[in-house]
Curated annotation (Swiss-Prot):
UniProt-recorded name of the protein: Magnesium and cobalt efflux protein CorC
Physiological role: Plays a role in the transport of magnesium and cobalt ions.
Annotated source species: Salmonella typhimurium (strain LT2 / SGSC1412 / ATCC 700720)
Listed InterPro entries: CBS_dom, CBS_dom_sf, CorC_N, FAD-bd_PCMH-like_sf, FAD-bd_PCMH_sub2, Ion_transp-like_CBS, Transptr-assoc_dom
Gene Ontology CC terms, in alphabetical order: plasma membrane
Highest taxon listed in the record's lineage: Bacteria
CBS domain sequence ranges: 73-133, 135-195
Family from the record: Belongs to the UPF0053 family.
NCBIfam families in UniProt: PRK15094.1
Pfam family, one: NMB0537_N
Length: 292
């Protein structure tokens, strides 16, 4: 407990020093609490003292201090894994299909994580006899972290210990998901896409236990069916329209609004429309029912 408290104090002090320096250059006086600080950052964006991307990143940096790994992890059901007894060709099939670079390796089931496989470690075997491949030759130690770990501490650990994936466990020692450094960076800079990412035509995609990415063009009817909600589609047909209607204007990326207990955050937008939103469902809500 003392370690967490001392770290929290150091984190708060370092943040206060950074933001005090920044805000002293932009404003007269210092904010007295978090809400005032957020308001000043947003005002600075609206007044064009800082650009939109900088504003979003500053908000993201503040957000990660309030979140736990459980809030951002890839849930167990969404984990793509390899089995310890799989052949080289079987591993390559999974790697090519998923386009991921790191995989938990399991034995019996997802509660039995044997280690982590990095796709690049298979390259030497592709130039020689595939029969020489053995998972034991490429298996790396899996880092295990609790669900309750603070996200800012997780990021610091990723950077200092130079690894990119950790297995998340619950209080009983069962595997509840995994977290990557990319998951944390996306909280700060927005969704990161690479040359392997295809344009997403999936309406609903789970990011963590309570957070989903929603295409703005997804229909309100489909959203209601999946999430058990009762949003009206009398005036607007899509989730993007619902969110814009609630704001009363075209919101910028990073703006957040609460609609009947569901928190909608604009993840992508341009000068004409909302493209994608993140929605956080209430903690006591059942998991959405999606068609396979």
């Amino acid at each position: 407990m003392s370690d967490d408290n001392s770290h929290s104090s150091d984190t708060v002090n370092s943040k206060k020093g950074f933001f005090s320096l920044l805000l002293s250059q932009l404003f007269h006086g210092e904010p007295k609490n978090r809400d005032e600080l957020l308001a000043l950052i947003r005002d600075s964006g609206q007044n064009e003292l800082i650009d939109e991307d900088t504003r979003d990143m500053l908000e993201g940096v503040m957000d990660i201090a309030d979140q736990r790994v459980r809030d951002i992890m890839i849930p167990r059901s969404q984990m793509i894994t390899l089995k310890r007894n799989q052949t080289l060709d079987e591993c390559l099939d999974v790697i090519i299909e998923s386009a991921h670079s790191r995989f938990p390796v399991i034995s019996e089931d997802k509660d039995h994580i044997e280690g982590i496989l990095m796709a690049k470690d298979l390259l030497p075997f592709m130039r020689s006899d595939a029969e020489a491949f053995s998972m034991d030759k490429v298996l790396r130690t899996a880092v295990v972290v609790p669900e309750s770990k603070r996200v800012d501490r997780m990021l610091k650990e990723f950077r200092s210990q130079r690894y990119h994936m950790a297995i998340v466990i619950d209080e009983f020692g069962g595997v509840s998901g995994l977290v990557t450094i990319e998951d944390i960076l996306e909280l700060i800079v927005g969704e990161i896409e690479d040359e392997y990412d295809e344009e997403d035509d999936i309406d609903f995609r789970q990011l963590s236990r309570h957070t989903w990415t929603i295409r703005a063009l997804a229909s309100i009817e489909d959203f209601n069916d999946a999430f058990g909600t009762h949003f009206s589609d009398e005036e607007v047909d899509t989730i993007g329209g619902l969110v814009m209607q609630a704001f009363g204007h075209l919101p910028a990326r990073g703006e957040t609004i609460d609609i009947d207990g569901y928190q909608f955050k604009v993840a992508m937008a341009d000068s004409r429309r909302i493209i994608q939103v993140h929605v956080r469902i209430p903690d006591d809500s059942p998991q959405p029912k999606l068609d396979e």
